[in-house]
Amino acid sequence: MNYQLIPVNLKKKVKKEDGKTEYVNYAEEIPQDPEMEKLLKSYQDKGDALLSQKVGKLNGKLEGDRTIIRFEQTNLGHLIAEAQRQKAKADIGIMNSGGIRDSIQEGDVTYKDILKIHPFGNIVSYFELTGKELLDYLNVVALKEVDSGAYAQYSGISMTVNRADKKVKNVKIQGKPLDLNKTYRISLPSYNAAGGDGYPVMTKNPTFVNTGFIDADVLKEFFEKNSPINAEKYIPHNEVIFK
């Protein structure tokens, strides 16, 4: 059996005899059902109340516009990577720019603002790599092209990315030089851990953990715990240099 989705009271544009246009219903108009409207309104009100819930206060702007965050490191990218890093108790936080869909403006921050940033319900995950394995991993992830959702934002790491040589250099974790024999924990959205955006697949790594923590909830909790948040605190200071 075939089904077709037909919008209620769909209109079409028609030209009248005098040359003007107007919109008319394709079929007989279906009147609103007051009882159903009343029933649905109660759920809408509950949803609006939840979305308008204040989760924190922001001084300054956190930049998440796709024309910026997919080209350079931003304070919002840094903050989100840091929030997920802390939640996973990781050494490094990596966040794909494609998972950040909006900016946050100065003032009161609501749950709706959080969901505009993270509308997909991605899960925070983590895995562990030796320093040598991490270097190989970064030689893939850090070289993802700008103007794509794969372009990564970071926390807990500094490095120089040489696009010509296709290698990262001068890697430091938490301010200390990368130890090739040490084991490091990395937080990452589950989407990318599964190979999304062309990232190396980490879900088969024996240390991989899906935390079950939804990205929007992690960001909401970070605001609740750290409010008021000063946007300037998260401005990148050339921790990641591209050449």
Region spans (language model):
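Generic structural signal of hydrophobic/aromatic residues within well-ordered alpha-helices
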Residues: 36-47, 51-58, 114, 134, ...
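Proline-rich intrinsically disordered, low-complexity coils
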Residues: 7, 31-34, 47, 63, ...
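Electropositive phosphate-/nucleotide-binding environments in soluble metabolic enzymes
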Residues: 33-37, 41, 52, 74-78, ...
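Hydrophobic alpha-helical scaffolding
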Residues: 26-33, 37, 48, 66-74, ...
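Short amphipathic
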Residues: 4, 56-60, 126-128
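Active-site-adjacent helix-turn-beta-strand microarchitecture at beta-sheet edges
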Residues: 1-53, 145-153, 160-161, 167-171
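Feature captures C-terminal
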Residues: 14, 19-23, 78-243
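Glycine-rich phosphate/diphosphate-binding loops and the adjacent beta-loop-alpha structural elements
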Residues: 53-73
